[in-house]
């Protein structure tokens, strides 16, 4: 077909307006002639609006986008080489960091286990009939303020 992509979108919008107008006219119980006239007027209106938008876009905005796109196309081979180099450097840096972090994690795993032992793990049923829904709460053994807040919360839920 010899219709441009923009014109296809304009026609699609106009035909959609025609169809929607006809369907809504039928639901309202209007006469056939009234539905036909209103549908055709809306088709023409949306077609003209679409052509105006395309004209404004091509006249005023196409230069903006064409210069931006042409600049990107010229710099694309350089950007590809630069991005490959950056990717390789980033990959090497991540490998070095992961080795360092693994060595740190091995030495600090004992500290982590001691930290976990400070907390008491308690489970409460959210709903009494279901074992699937359990709520995990972490309470530090030596902090009475946290325990008091938890008790206040539980008492307010019961009321």
UniProtKB/Swiss-Prot annotation:
<keyword id="KW-0812">Transmembrane</keyword>
<protein>
    <recommendedName>
        <fullName>Uncharacterized protein BB_0268</fullName>
    </recommendedName>
</protein>
<keyword id="KW-0472">Membrane</keyword>
<keyword id="KW-1133">Transmembrane helix</keyword>
<feature type="transmembrane region" description="Helical">
    <location>
        <begin position="17"/>
        <end position="37"/>
    </location>
</feature>
<dbReference type="GO" id="GO:0005886">
    <property type="term" value="C:plasma membrane"/>
</dbReference>
<keyword id="KW-1003">Cell membrane</keyword>
<feature type="transmembrane region" description="Helical">
    <location>
        <begin position="40"/>
        <end position="60"/>
    </location>
</feature>
């Amino acid at each position: 077909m010899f219709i441009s992509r923009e014109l296809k979108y304009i026609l699609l919008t106009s035909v959609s307006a025609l169809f929607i107008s006809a369907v809504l006219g039928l639901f309202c119980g209007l006469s056939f002639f009234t539905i036909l006239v209103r549908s055709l007027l809306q088709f023409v209106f949306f077609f003209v609006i679409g052509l105006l938008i395309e004209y404004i876009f091509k006249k005023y905005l196409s230069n903006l986008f064409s210069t931006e796109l042409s600049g990107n196309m010229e710099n694309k081979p350089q950007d590809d080489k630069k991005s490959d180099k950056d990717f390789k450097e980033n990959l090497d840096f991540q490998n070095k960091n992961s080795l360092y972090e693994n060595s740190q994690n091995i030495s600090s795993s004992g500290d982590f286990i001691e930290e976990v032992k400070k907390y008491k793990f308690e489970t409460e049923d959210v709903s009494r009939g279901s074992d699937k829904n359990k709520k995990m709460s972490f309470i530090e053994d030596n902090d009475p303020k946290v325990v008091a807040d938890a008790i206040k919360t539980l008492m307010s839920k019961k009321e």
